[in-house]
Amino acid sequence: MTTFETPRETVFIESVDSIPQSKKTHVFAICVTVDNKPIVAARRSSFVFQEITMNMNPPIVVTISKHLTNYMYNNEIKEIKRKLQKGSAPIYKTSFEELILLGGKLNKSETIDDCIRREIKEETDSKLTIKSIGTTCVKITITDKLFNRKYVNYCKLCYIDELMEEVISFVIYNVEIRKLKSLLDCDNNDKFNYLRFIYNTLLYSK
């Protein structure tokens, strides 16, 4: 097991022989282009903003930690600022981007690979053509330090027919995904080191 610490997450990564076939299972994929480059996605909204807005009751924010704004998009910060009461702490702009892997929760009637195929189709507006899905897998256990939440996910590689140049040019209208990106271009992101480790582990364990 390998551990990564970021300012907002503690991440445990371990190779596993199989993925539980359960409706509680969350499975994701790092897609690999035909020119051998790994793909991640940028989320339309940040997890921090989602958490804050889901728990606004009443829907007025009295104050918000500057630390939380480091993990929000600028349009979200403006929205929160609009709801802030007079005299609350200032909010600063960030260059934040919420990276995620493509995938999601397993349906009862699906296999693991069926779930990956369905989620990738939905999240990319059917833009990616899947050739094959790898057989090796890793278990990813994430503790969110900001909200004290724990998540258990699984990940595989998914090989596609498109070149990276094509992938990054796609316009995505999915409600959750704003665009697809090369993981290798995201080295300034707080998730980069552990996402790259996951990719390399899956790639060289095949």
Swiss-Prot record:
The active site is at E119. The keyword Hydrolase applies. Keywords: Hydrolase, Magnesium, Manganese, Metal-binding. Its EC number is 3.1.3.-. It comes from Rabbit fibroma virus (strain Kasza) (RFV). This is mRNA-decapping protein D9. Residues 23-206 form the Nudix hydrolase domain. GO terms for molecular function: hydrolase activity; metal ion binding. Its cofactor is Mg(2+); Mn(2+). It comes from the Viruses. Induction: Expressed in the early phase of the viral replicative cycle. Mg(2+) binds at E110, E123, D144. Belongs to the Nudix hydrolase family. SUPFAM superfamilies: Nudix. The keyword Magnesium applies. Decapping enzyme required for the removal of the 5'-end m7GpppN cap tethered to viral and host mRNAs to allow their decay in cells. May therefore accelerate viral and cellular mRNA turnover to eliminate competing host mRNAs and allow stage-specific synthesis of viral proteins. Acceleration of the turnover of cellular transcripts may even promote the shutoff of host protein synthesis. Does not cleave unmethylated RNAs or RNAs shorter than 24 nucleotides. A motif (Nudix box) lies at residues 104-125. InterPro entries: NUDIX_hydrolase-like_dom_sf, NUDIX_hydrolase_dom, Viral_VD9. Pfam families: NUDIX (PF00293).
